C-alpha cells in the first residue's frame, strides 16, 4: 500500500473523527447540542446570527 492510501482508509462512522464543523470542517471543540455541529470558535463568531443571546 502506498502512503496516501493508508491514512484515513478506515471509514469513520462514530467518534470524534466522524463529525466536523459545518463552517470550517474542524474536528475539535464541536458543539453538537441542538444539532448545531459547529465548533466553539465559529459559534462565538455567529451566535447572534443564529439567535443565541447572552443574558448577563
Curated annotation (Swiss-Prot):
Record flagged with keyword Metal-binding: yes
Keywords assigned by UniProt, alphabetized: Metal-binding, Ribonucleoprotein, Ribosomal protein, Zinc
Keyword Ribosomal protein assigned: yes
From the record, what ranges are coiled-coil? none
One biological-process term from Gene Ontology? cytoplasmic translation
In which residues is Zn(2+) bound?
Answer: 21, 24, 39, 42
Note the superkingdom of the native organism: Eukaryota
Q: How is the cofactor bound?
A: Binds 1 zinc ion per subunit.
- State any single GO MF term: zinc ion binding
InterPro entries attached here? Ribosomal_uS14, Ribosomal_uS14_CS, RIbosomal_uS14_euk_arc, Ribosomal_uS14_sf
Give GO cellular component annotations, separated by semicolons.
Answer: cytosolic small ribosomal subunit; extracellular region
Q: Name the coenzymes or cofactors required.
A: Zn(2+)
Under Pfam families, the record lists:
Ribosomal_S14
PANTHER family xref list: 40S RIBOSOMAL PROTEIN S29
Q: Which family does it belong to?
A: Belongs to the universal ribosomal protein uS14 family.
Q: What is the name of this protein?
A: Small ribosomal subunit protein uS14
From which lineage does this chain's organism come?
Eukaryota, Fungi, Dikarya, Ascomycota, Saccharomycotina
Amino acid at each position: 500500500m502506498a502512503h496516501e492510501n493508508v491514512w484515513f482508509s478506515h471509514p469513520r462512522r462514530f467518534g470524534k473523527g466522524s463529525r466536523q464543523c459545518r463552517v470550517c470542517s474542524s474536528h475539535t471543540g464541536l458543539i453538537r447540542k441542538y444539532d448545531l455541529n459547529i465548533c466553539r470558535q465559529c459559534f462565538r463568531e455567529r451566535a447572534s446570527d443564529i439567535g443565541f443571546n447572552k443574558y448577563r
